[in-house]
């Protein structure tokens, strides 16, 4: 950001040059040359900031993939790292679990506001607060919103909540953070990236090829999905059921995969050249 400001890149968009495209290309080439001087170096795992998201959940989400991510989160936090849990509407019905783990009264009150503000957002726009789970969730075996939310919150593990963030607010506290964003997969994952996540762990039982602006590790809740969509899925948590893989071992494998991706290994979406982003928009679009 400092380099961006020092080179006056914003001037291009203020129309202070005659040919915006030519000037922008010139400055971007300078920026690329500057970026090329960076060299990969070893850093401690405590420098990692990992977003956690689920989508297309099924009956195994709360049994395999989400608990695996939760245990991963605890492992990373114990090493001084940072995780981000978002998709606030998916917390409805299980929010007290997170509230009871807030590190102090201020964070507790922020978490209460986080939940209630999103409910007010639903009401303001005439939407049913509890219009969940989706038809796909029900087909996959989820019965109620509480069922879905209890699965969602498992991604947070058992660590104390150390931060509560507004939408796209940068992370400034290590440990488990809660982030205000909707349940929409791409909007929520993009919000994690905007808040500083270098990677997003995305659990799914129904399957989706989506990917966010940062490496998106897609974790299957069941082995059938992992087998059918091997070009989408990076990690098969379904082995906890089909192969009696201990949860702790699954979390350790996932932790190693995260380290590998942070070290340059490409996830399936990157290999396919697929990524996208979506900004959370409120109000009327004209």
Question: Where are these predicted regions, by residue range?
Answer:
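Short N-terminal secondary-structure initiator segments
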Residues: 1, 18-38, 169-185
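Single conserved hydrophobic/aromatic residue that forms the stacking wall/gate
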Residues: 2-13
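Short, flexible, glycine/charge-rich loop motifs used to bind or transfer phosphoryl groups or to couple energy/partner
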Residues: 2-3, 39-41, 190
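A generic structural motif
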Residues: 11-16, 87
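Glycine-rich, mobile lid/loop segments that gate access to catalytic sites or pores
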Residues: 15-59, 64-65
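Anaerobic metallocofactor- and corrinoid-dependent redox/one-carbon enzyme cores
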Residues: 47, 52, 58-286
